[in-house]
C-alpha cells in the first residue's frame, strides 16, 4: 500500500473571517490527505444532503424559499432543521469545534474503508481518518455521535425525507443548475461532484466515504475538491461579493449578478441572463427579450409574427432568420436527386436529401409508401387510396416527385409486373417522357368507381383555391378566356391522344378528382394545376367494353367542336381505333404499350421522323440562303409551336405543360429557380431561360391586344380550313382553343397598333398551291423551323447591309418560312412586284402576311416586305431598282415571340460597313439574341430618314399604346440629341401618367415621379447605351456621361479646387474631393512657395512662369495615358524629389509625376463617387475607359516616357 502523506496542519484554515457565524463545524487536526490515484476511490459517489442548515439562511432568507443553490436537489426538510438548530443554539449547546476550523477528513486507503457513514441511522457514527490503525480526536467523534443522534430523532418526528429514502424514490427529481461562472472556475469541483452525483450509488457504504461541506452540505470524495469549494464559495473578505440568500461568495460582481438569477422564478431567469449590463438596448415588446443590435430584434420579431421571408429554392422550405437560411443553403442537403437528364443518380439514396419524403414531418404516408416501394411490394387498394391524402400543399410537390422518380415511375414501375394488367399505373404510356407524369400513380383504383373518390374533395379544393389565386393574381390584365387557357384546357388534343380513353370519361373520373371550373367545364386537378402533365398515351386493358364505347362517343363529340379546323379525314383517323394499343401511323395493333412504343419510335415506316432519318436529302429543305437551320432555332421553334408537337418521339411536347405550370406560378424565376426547373424538365438551363423570356413577351403582347376578340371571329367561317399539319407548328395558341383565340399573326398585328387593320389575303395571291404530302404535325426536327437570323450568322451577308445587292435580295426578299417543308414558290420577282406599294403611301400593306386560317400550306409570314418611299434622300438609291429586299428595321417582328415593333433605328442610321452613330452596335446579321435587349424601344417603322419620320407623323396617327407615346408632332423631333437621349420616339412629355400622377414602367410594376427617371429606368430592361465614344467606342446610357468621359481623352479639366489648385475632369471627382479631402488638401500658398523654391534652385524660371507651365501641364494630359501604368513607370526611377529639383529636365518629370498622382486621386475619387451619380455602371465604365481607351499615339507617347525614365535611371546609376 502506498504510504500516506501526512498533513502538516489545517490546510484550509479560514484566516480572514474575523467573526465567523458558523458554530457547528467539526475540525480534524493533523489528518491524512491521501492522493486519489486508485480506481476504487473514483467509484465513490457524492451525496449532497440538506442535513446541516446554514444559520445565515435562517436570518436572511424566508423559510418558505428553498435554498436551491446550497443543494442541487429540493430539500423537503429545511424548515424542521432550521427550527431544530435554533433550539440547539438558544439552549446553549456547545460543540467542540476547535478553533473554528473546517472539516478535514480523508480516507487512508481502500482497505481501511470498513465502517459506514450512515447519517440517517439512529446510531449515527462517522468514520474518521485512520492513520496506521489509530483513531484521533475521539472526543470529536463522540460529539458527532451525540449530535447526529439527537438530530435524527427530531427529523423523524418532522417526517423528513432522508437521503436513503430519497435515493430509493422512482420519480424524477428537479435539479436547479448553477451559474456558468461557478461551474467553470478552476476546475469546478462542484461540477464534477454533480456529474458523479447523477450516478447511482454502487455500494451501500458509498456515502460513508464522502467529505461533506459544513456550509452547504455538498459531498466530495477528495479533500482538495472540498478545500477549493470552501475557498471559492464560502470564504469571505472585504473584496469578495457574497450572496445574501445562500452565502456564496464571488470574486466579481458580474458573477454574483448571474448567480442571483438562479434565485429568481424560472420565467425571469432567461430574461435576466440574456440582458447584459445596459448594452442590450433593443427589447422585444412581446416577450421582453433584449438584443444588442436592431437587426437581431427584427429577425426575432418574425418568430412572433410568423413571417418567413427566406425560401430555399430547392426544397421550398422557408426561414425567418437569415442565419438559418444561410446554413441551410450552405449545407446543400436539399439538392434534388434528379439529374439533368431526368434519371436518378445511382450513388444517392432516397432518404439522403431533404427532398426525399422522409425529411418532412408530415409525410408519414409517403414514408410508408417509399418503404413498400423499396421492398418491391405492390400497393394495396387502400394504400393507393391513401396517396390522395398525402399532400395538401402544392409547395411539397417536390417530395412526391422525387419519390416517384426514385422508383422509376416514368415507365418501368413496379406495377409493370404486378397485378394491374401488366401496365403502368393509369395506363401511362412508357414513352411519355414527362418527369412529372408519376403524379397519377396509384390513383386509378379509387377512381374507377370506388366510393373513396369523394373523401379528399376538401383537400383538392384547397389546392385548387391556391392555384386559382396564384394564376388570377398574375393574369389580372388578361381576359377570362386567356386565364382559362393558361390554367388548363377544357378539351384535349384529339390528334395527339387517340388512346386517351379512360381519363376524360365522365363516368370514369379523370386523373385526380373532378372539379368544376369558372365556366362549368369539368376537368381534373392534375390538368388544372399542371396543364395535362399526366396525359396518358394508352388506355388500361382492364377497361370494360362499355367504357370504351362511352369514351369513343365522347371523343366524337369533342371532334365535332373542331370541325372548322380539322378535316373529315383527320377526324375519322382519330376515333376509328381498332385496339387500345395501335400505331398512330400505320394502325398496327400491339399487345402492350412497350411494343407499341418500340414500333412507333424506331420501326414504323410510316413515321415521318424515321423517313427523315432514312432519307435525309429528300425531306430536308435548305433555307433560302442555302444554309441549314441551327439547332437553337430548331429548339426554339419546337417549343413555340407547343401543341403542334404531340408525337411520342417528340422530346419537347411533354415539357411544355410543365414549363407553363412553372410559368403560371412564377413569371420571373431567378437563376436558382431556373436551375431547378431545368433539372425537373430535363432541359438545359439556357433553353428554359429563353423559353421564359419569350413566354413573357407573348403574354405581354396578349395582355395589350385591344382587338383580341374582333380579330378572332373571322377564323371560324373559312372556305379552306387548314390542316393541323400546317396550322399547329405556327402558333403557341393551342389548337382546340383556336375558335376563341387568334393566331399568333393576328395577335401580333393587333398589338402593333401602328398600322391599319390586318388585311387577309388568299394564298393564291403569291403562290402556286400544290398538294403537299401530309406530314406528321408533331415533328420536332422540321427542316424549316423558325429561322431567327434570316440566314445563318456564319454565312450571313446582312452585316454589310446593301439593299441593292443580289445577296440582300436573295436572302431577304422572301418572307421567313415558319411552316413545314413545302415546294418552291413562284419566283421572287413576282413576289416583289405584287407587294410593291405606291410612293408616299402611308397605309402599310400586309400582303406578305397570310392568315393561318385561310392558307393551309403557305408559311405564316411574320416579316414585312420593305416599302419604298419617294423621298429625295433615297430616290437616287432605290427609284430604279424594282426588287425589294427585307428591311430588318420594319414594323413586323422577325419571330413569333417579339412584339411587332421595330427594335432598331431606321436603315439610314446604319451605314453598310459599320455605324458611327452613338448607341448603335455593328449589325450582326439579325442575330436572334441581339433582339431581346431592344424589344421595348422602337424607332418609327418604315422610315428611312428624319424627313421621312417627320413627314409620316404629319399624315398618320399611331393607334393604341404606341400612338399615346408618340402623339404630338412638335414634341416628337427636336434633333439627333432627343433621338438618342430620349430614346427615339418615346417623347418625355407624352409618356402617360398613371391615376396617381406617377410615370409607370410598362415592362414592370415600378413607378416614377419624373419621366426622365422612367427613361433612365427603362435602360435597365433594354441594356441600351445610345451614346458612344468616338475614340474608344465605349457606350453610355446618358449624354452627360459621354461628355465627362470624353474629357479623359481630351485632357480637359474644368473643375479646380480653390485650396490646392488640383483640377478635375469629372464633376463627381470634384465633389468627392471638396466633400472629403478639402480639409487637408494642399493650400495654394504652399504650391506657390514650392514653385518659388524650384525657381531659385533652377535660376532660369520665374515663379509665375513656373506656375503657368504647371497649370498648362495639368490641363493637357496625354490622351489615353493609363494611370495604372503611370504609377508603375513613375516610381521606377529611384530619385528623390530633391534630385529631380537639381536638374532642369527632371523638374518637368516631377511635374509629370504630380500630374499622374492627381490622375490617380481623380480615378480613386470617381470610384468612390456613388452618391453623385446614380448609375454605378457609368463609373465602372469610365474607370475602365481610363485604362483601355488609349490610341496609338498615346501608346507611343507612353513608350517614350518609359524610355526616358529608363535613361534617367541609367544616368543616375552611372
From Swiss-Prot:
Residues 702-715, 780-808, 840-854 have a biased composition (Low complexity). SMART domains: HOX, ZnF_C2H2. Induction: Down-regulated by microRNA-221 (miR-221). A zinc finger (C2H2-type) spans 211-234, 241-263, 282-304, 310-334, 581-605, 999-1021, 1027-1049, 1055-1076. Residues 89-98, 1127-1155, 1168-1179, 1186-1205 have a biased composition (Basic and acidic residues). It is linked to Mowat-Wilson syndrome: A complex developmental disorder characterized by intellectual disability, delayed motor development, epilepsy, microcephaly and a wide spectrum of clinically heterogeneous features suggestive of neurocristopathies at the cephalic, cardiac, and vagal levels. Affected patients show an easily recognizable facial appearance with deep set eyes and hypertelorism, medially divergent, broad eyebrows, prominent columella, pointed chin and uplifted, notched ear lobes. Some patients manifest Hirschsprung disease. Binds activated SMAD1, activated SMAD2 and activated SMAD3; binding with SMAD4 is not detected. Interacts with CBX4 and CTBP1. Transcriptional inhibitor that binds to DNA sequence 5'-CACCT-3' in different promoters. Represses transcription of E-cadherin. Represses expression of MEOX2. The keyword Phosphoprotein applies. One of its GO terms (molecular function) is zinc ion binding. Residues 1156-1167 have a biased composition (Acidic residues). Residues 1-101, 702-740, 771-810, 832-857, 1117-1214 are annotated as: Disordered. The modification Phosphothreonine is found at residue 782. It comes from Homo sapiens. There is a cross-link at residues 391, 479, 555, 611, 632, 713, 866 (Glycyl lysine isopeptide (Lys-Gly) (interchain with G-Cter in SUMO2)). Residues 57-74 have a biased composition (Polar residues). Belongs to the delta-EF1/ZFH-1 C2H2-type zinc-finger family. Sumoylation on Lys-391 and Lys-866 is promoted by the E3 SUMO-protein ligase CBX4, and impairs interaction with CTBP1 and transcription repression activity. There is a cross-link at residues 391, 866 (Glycyl lysine isopeptide (Lys-Gly) (interchain with G-Cter in SUMO)). It comes from the Eukaryota. This is Zinc finger E-box-binding homeobox 2.
Amino acid at each position: 500500500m502506498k504510504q500516506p502523506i501526512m498533513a502538516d496542519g489545517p490546510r484550509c484554515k479560514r484566516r480572514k473571517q474575523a467573526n465567523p457565524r458558523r458554530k457547528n463545524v467539526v475540525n480534524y487536526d493533523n489528518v491524512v490527505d491521501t492522493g486519489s490515484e486508485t480506481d476504487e476511490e473514483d467509484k465513490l459517489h457524492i451525496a449532497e444532503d440538506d442535513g446541516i442548515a446554514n444559520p445565515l439562511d435562517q436570518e436572511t432568507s424566508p423559510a418558505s424559499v428553498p435554498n436551491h443553490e446550497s443543494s442541487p436537489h429540493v430539500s423537503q426538510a429545511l424548515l424542521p432543521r432550521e427550527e431544530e438548530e435554533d433550539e440547539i443554539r438558544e439552549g446553549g449547546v456547545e460543540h467542540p469545534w476547535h478553533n473554528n476550523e473546517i472539516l478535514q477528513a480523508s480516507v487512508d486507503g481502500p482497505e481501511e474503508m470498513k465502517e459506514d457513514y450512515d447519517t440517517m441511522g439512529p446510531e449515527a457514527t462517522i468514520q474518521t481518518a485512520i492513520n496506521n490503525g489509530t483513531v484521533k480526536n475521539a472526543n470529536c467523534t463522540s460529539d458527532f455521535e451525540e449530535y447526529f443522534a439527537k438530530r435524527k430523532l427530531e427529523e423523524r418526528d418532522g417526517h423528513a425525507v432522508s437521503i436513503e429514502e430519497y435515493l430509493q424514490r422512482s420519480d424524477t427529481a428537479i435539479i436547479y443548475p448553477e451559474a456558468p461562472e461557478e461551474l467553470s472556475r478552476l476546475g469546478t469541483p462542484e461540477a464534477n461532484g454533480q456529474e458523479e452525483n447523477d450516478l447511482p450509488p454502487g455500494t451501500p457504504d458509498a456515502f460513508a466515504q464522502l467529505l461533506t461541506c459544513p456550509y452547504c452540505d455538498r459531498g466530495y470524495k477528495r479533500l482538495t475538491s472540498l478545500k477549493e469549494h470552501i475557498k471559492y464559495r464560502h470564504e469571505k473578505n472585504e473584496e469578495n461579493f457574497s450572496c445574501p440568500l445562500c452565502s456564496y461568495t464571488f470574486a466579481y460582481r458580474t458573477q454574483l449578478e448571474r448567480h442571483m438569477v438562479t434565485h429568481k422564478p424560472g420565467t425571469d431567469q432567461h430574461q435576466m441572463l440574456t440582458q447584459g449590463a445596459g448594452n442590450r438596448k433593443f427589447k422585444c415588446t412581446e416577450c421582453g427579450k433584449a438584443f444588442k443590435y436592431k437587426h437581431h430584434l427584427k429577425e426575432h420579431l418574425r418568430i412572433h409574427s410568423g413571417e418567413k421571408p427566406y425560401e430555399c429554392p430547392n426544397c421550398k422550405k422557408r426561414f425567418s432568420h437569415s442565419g438559418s437560411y444561410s446554413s441551410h443553403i450552405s449545407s446543400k442537403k436539399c439538392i434534388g436527386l434528379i439529374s439533368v437528364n431526368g434519371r436518378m443518380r445511382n450513388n444517392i439514396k432516397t432518404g439522403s436529401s431533404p427532398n426525399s419524403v422522409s425529411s418532412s414531418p408530415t409525410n408519414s404516408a409517403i414514408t410508408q409508401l417509399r418503404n413498400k416501394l423499396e421492398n418491391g411490394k405492390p400497393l394495396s387498394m387502400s394504400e393507393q387510396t391513401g396517396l390522395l391524402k398525402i399532400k395538401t400543399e402544392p409547395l411539397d410537390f417536390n417530395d412526391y416527385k422525387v419519390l416517384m422518380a426514385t422508383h422509376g415511375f416514368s415507365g418501368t414501375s413496379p406495377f409493370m409486373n404486378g397485378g394491374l394488367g401488366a401496365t403502368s399505373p393509369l395506363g401511362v404510356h412508357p414513352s411519355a417522357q414527362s418527369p412529372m407524369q408519376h403524379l397519377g400513380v396509384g390513383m386509378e383504383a379509387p377512381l374507377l368507381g370506388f366510393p373513396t373518390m369523394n373523401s379528399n374533395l376538401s383537400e383538392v379544393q384547397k389546392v385548387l383555391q391556391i392555384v386559382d389565386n396564384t394564376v388570377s393574381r398574375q393574369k389580372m390584365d388578361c381576359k377570362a378566356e386567356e386565364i382559362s387557357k393558361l390554367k388548363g384546357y377544357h378539351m384535349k388534343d384529339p390528334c395527339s391522344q387517340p388512346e386517351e380513353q379512360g381519363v376524360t370519361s365522365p363516368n370514369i373520373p379523370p386523373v385526380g378528382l373532378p372539379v368544376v371550373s369558372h365556366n362549368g367545364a369539368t376537368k381534373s386537378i392534375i390538368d388544372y394545376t399542371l396543364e395535362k402533365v399526366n396525359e396518358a398515351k394508352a388506355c388500361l386493358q382492364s377497361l370494360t367494353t362499355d367504357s370504351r364505347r362511352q369514351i369513343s362517343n365522347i371523343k366524337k363529340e369533342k371532334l365535332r367542336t373542331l370541325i372548322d379546323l380539322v378535316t373529315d379525314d383527320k377526324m375519322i383517323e382519330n376515333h376509328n381505333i381498332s385496339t387500345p394499343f395501335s400505331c398512330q401511323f400505320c394502325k398496327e395493333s400491339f399487345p402492350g404499350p412497350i411494343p407499341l412504343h418500340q414500333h412507333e419510335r424506331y420501326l414504323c415506316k410510316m413515321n415521318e421522323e424515321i423517313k427523315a432519318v432514312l432519307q435525309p436529302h429528300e425531306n430536308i429543305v435548305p433555307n433560302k440562303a442555302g444554309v441549314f437551320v441551327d439547332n437553337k432555332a430548331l429548339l426554339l421553334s419546337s417549343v413555340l409551336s407547343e401543341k403542334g408537337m404531340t408525337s411520342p418521339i417528340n422530346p419537347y411536347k411533354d415539357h411544355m405543360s410543365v414549363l407553363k405550370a412553372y410559368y403560371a406560378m412564377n413569371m420571373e424565376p431567378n437563376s436558382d429557380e431556373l436551375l431547378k426547373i431545368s433539372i425537373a424538365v430535363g432541359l438545359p438551363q439556357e433553353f428554359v431561360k429563353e423559353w421564359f423570356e419569350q413566354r413573357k413577351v407573348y403574354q405581354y403582347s396578349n395582355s395589350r391586344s385591344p382587338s383580341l376578340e374582333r380579330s378572332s371571329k373571322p377564323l371560324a367561317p373559312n372556305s379552306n380550313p387548314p390542316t393541323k399539319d400546317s396550322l399547329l407548328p405556327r402558333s403557341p395558341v393551342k389548337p382546340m382553343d383556336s375558335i376563341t383565340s387568334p393566331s399568333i399573326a393576328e395577335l401580333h398585328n393587333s398589338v402593333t397598333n401602328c398600322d391599319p387593320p390586318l388585311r387577309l389575303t388568299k394564298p393564291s395571291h403569291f403562290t402556286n398551291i400544290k398538294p403537299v404530302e401530309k406530314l406528321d404535325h408533331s415533328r420536332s426536327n422540321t427542316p424549316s423551323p423558325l429561322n431567327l437570323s434570316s440566314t445563318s450568322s456564319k454565312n450571313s451577308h446582312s452585316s454589310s447591309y446593301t439593299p441593292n445587292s443580289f445577296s440582300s435580295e436573295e436572302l431577304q426578299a422572301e418572307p421567313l418560312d415558319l411552316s413545314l417543308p413545302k415546294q418552291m414558290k413562284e419566283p421572287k420577282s413576282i413576289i416583289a412586284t405584287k407587294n410593291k406599294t405606291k410612293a408616299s403611301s402611308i397605309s402599310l400593306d400586309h400582303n406578305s402576311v397570310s392568315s393561318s386560317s385561310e392558307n393551309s400550306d403557305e408559311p405564316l409570314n411574320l416579316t414585312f416586305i420593305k416599302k419604298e418611299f419617294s423621298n429625295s434622300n433615297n430616290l437616287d438609291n432605290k427609284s430604279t431598282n424594282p426588287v425589294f429586299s427585307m428591311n430588318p428595321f420594319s414594323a413586323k417582328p422577325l419571330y413569333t415571340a417579339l412584339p411587332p415593333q421595330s427594335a432598331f433605328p431606321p436603315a439610314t442610321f446604319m451605314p453598310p460597313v459599320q455605324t458611327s452613330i452613338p448607341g448603335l452596335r455593328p449589325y450582326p446579321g439579325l442575330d436572334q439574341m441581339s433582339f431581346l435587349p431592344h424589344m421595348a424601344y422602337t424607332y418609327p417603322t418604315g422610315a428611312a430618314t428624319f424627313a421621312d419620320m417627320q413627314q409620316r407623323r404629319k399624315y398618320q396617327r399611331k393607334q393604341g399604346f404606341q400612338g399615346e407615346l408618340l402623339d404630338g408632332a412638335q414634341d416628337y423631333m427636336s434633333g439627333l440629341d432627343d433621338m438618342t437621349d430620349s430614346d427615339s420616339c418615346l417623347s418625355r412629355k407624352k409618356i402617360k401618367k398613371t391615376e396617381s400622377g406617377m410615370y409607370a414602367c410598362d415592362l414592370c410594376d415600378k413607378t416614377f415621379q419624373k419621366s426622365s427617371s422612367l427613361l433612365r429606368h427603362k435602360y435597365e430592361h433594354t441594356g441600351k447605351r445610345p451614346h458612344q465614344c468616338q475614340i474608344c467606342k465605349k457606350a453610355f446610357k446618358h449624354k452627360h456621361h459621354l461628355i465627362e468621359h470624353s474629357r479623359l481623352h481630351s485632357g480637359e479639366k474644368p473643375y479646380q479646387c480653390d485650396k490646392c489648385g488640383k483640377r478635375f475632369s469629372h464633376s463627381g471627382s470634384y465633389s468627392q474631393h471638396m466633400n472629403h479631402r478639402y480639409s487637408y488638401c494642399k493650400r495654394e500658398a504652399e504650391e506657390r512657395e514650392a514653385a518659388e523654391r524650384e525657381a531659385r534652385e533652377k535660376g532660369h524660371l520665374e515663379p509665375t512662369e513656373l506656375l503657368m507651365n504647371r497649370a498648362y501641364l495639368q490641363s493637357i494630359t496625354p490622351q489615353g495615358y493609363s494611370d495604372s501604368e503611370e504609377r508603375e513607370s513613375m516610381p521606377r526611377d529611384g530619385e528623390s524629389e530633391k534630385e529631380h529639383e537639381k536638374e532642369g529636365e527632371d523638374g518637368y518629370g516631377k511635374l509629370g509625376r504630380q500630374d499622374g498622382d492627381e490622375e490617380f486621386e481623380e480615378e480613386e475619387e470617381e470610384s468612390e463617387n456613388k452618391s453623385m451619380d446614380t448609375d454605378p455602371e457609368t463609373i465602372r465604365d469610365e474607370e475602365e475607359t481610363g485604362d483601355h481607351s488609349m490610341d496609338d499615339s498615346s501608346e507611343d507617347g507612353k513608350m517614350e516616357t518609359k524610355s526616358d525614365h529608363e535613361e534617367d535611371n541609367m544616368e543616375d546609376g552611372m
